From Swiss-Prot:
It comes from the Bacteria. It comes from Chlorobaculum tepidum (strain ATCC 49652 / DSM 12025 / NBRC 103806 / TLS). The gene is accD. Acetyl-CoA carboxylase is a heterohexamer composed of biotin carboxyl carrier protein (AccB), biotin carboxylase (AccC) and two subunits each of ACCase subunit alpha (AccA) and ACCase subunit beta (AccD). This is Acetyl-coenzyme A carboxylase carboxyl transferase subunit beta. The lineage of its organism: Bacteria, Pseudomonadati, Chlorobiota, Chlorobiia, Chlorobiales. Zn(2+) binds at C27, C30, C46, C49. Keywords: ATP-binding, Cytoplasm, Fatty acid biosynthesis, Fatty acid metabolism, Lipid biosynthesis, Lipid metabolism, Metal-binding, Nucleotide-binding, Transferase, Zinc, Zinc-finger. HAMAP family: AcetylCoA_CT_beta. It catalyses: N(6)-carboxybiotinyl-L-lysyl-[protein] + acetyl-CoA = N(6)-biotinyl-L-lysyl-[protein] + malonyl-CoA. Residues 23-278 form the CoA carboxyltransferase N-terminal domain.
């Protein structure tokens, strides 16, 4: 027997399955719940605390180049397997599965376009592809970006976002440190500006090679920058590390980073800096 009856139907909340996946994200710093549109409007930075989410090269290209117009080059390069490396799965299988899952072909993309009305070359790394690790393809792409910069007599901007060298390629990966560094000297010989933008994280062989070789080394706020990770260092020296150790602000204080730029100011700041470097 029903004793009570609702005069007005209750509000029905959406089932979890009715809410599109990926619509909300949680800020890793302050814990705020952020809507996808809100993140897009703020270039994937938290409007509450300023935390910078990791983003892909194509997103950087879309807001750095004039009118979001850019043209990719050397997209066809693919990784080989010179060592026949196997960990939990063969290296070629790992690359294929990452490509299928991410929709990306490698951990680096190169593009040309206009920046402030002038030609520019941007090479962007992607942590979402095997940790942004540098293997032979990534090294070759950065080297070719330097070549394109020389060809166009245009400034080069490299956006680093990587855990370091790709262990699956062994010495072939480590060779890319010398290769990229040597190729970048051609820009200096011709007076072509090279700006290194370090984002979170810029570690290992990346920080030990081209990421620190810019005419200007700039960074996004609170980016982790270093060679070995803080936990490895702490466990090795058996001592606590200084507060903020290996963060962009710490490196700027000690002279390794020239300036720190919020993502919303990045395009304007790059145009201004390149204007001074002509």
């Amino acid at each position: 027997m029903v004793w009570f009856k609702r005069a007005i139907p209750s509000i029905r909340t959406k089932d979890k399955r009715d809410t599109p996946e990926g619509l909300w994200s949680k800020c890793d710093s302050c814990g705020a719940a952020l809507h996808k549109k809100q993140l897009e409007d703020h270039l994937y930075t938290c409007p509450h605390c300023g935390f910078h989410f990791r983003i892909s090269p194509d997103l950087y290209f879309s807001f750095l180049f004039d009118d979001g117009k850019w043209e990719e080059f050397d997209a066809q390069l693919r990784a080989a397997d010179p060592l026949k490396f196997v960990d939990t799965k063969p290296y070629p299988e790992r690359v294929r599965s990452t490509m299928q899952k991410s929709g990306k072909s490698e951990a680096c993309r190169n593009a040309t376009g206009k920046l402030g009305g002038s030609d520019a070359v941007i090479s962007g790394m992607d942590f979402g592809f095997i940790g942004g690790s540098m293997g032979s393809v990534v090294g070759e792409k950065i080297a070719r970006a330097a070549d394109k910069s020389v060809e166009l007599n245009a400034p080069l901007i490299v956006i680093s976002q990587s855990g370091g060298a790709r262990m699956m390629e062994g010495a072939f990966s480590l060779m890319q440190m010398a290769k990229t560094s040597a190729r970048l000297t051609r820009l200096g010989e011709r007076g072509i500006p090279f700006i290194s933008l370090m984002t979170d994280p810029t570690m290992g062989g990346i920080s030990a090679s081209f990421a620190m070789l810019g005419d200007l080394n700039i960074s996004e706020p609170k980016a982790l920058i270093g060679f070995a990770g803080p936990r490895v260092i702490r466990d090795t020296i058996k001592r606590d590390l200084p507060e903020g150790f290996q963060r962009a602000e710490f490196l700027q204080k000690h002279g390794f980073v020239d300036t720190i730029v919020h993502r919303k100011d990045l395009r304007a700041q790059l145009i201004k800096l390149l204007g001074h470097m002509k």
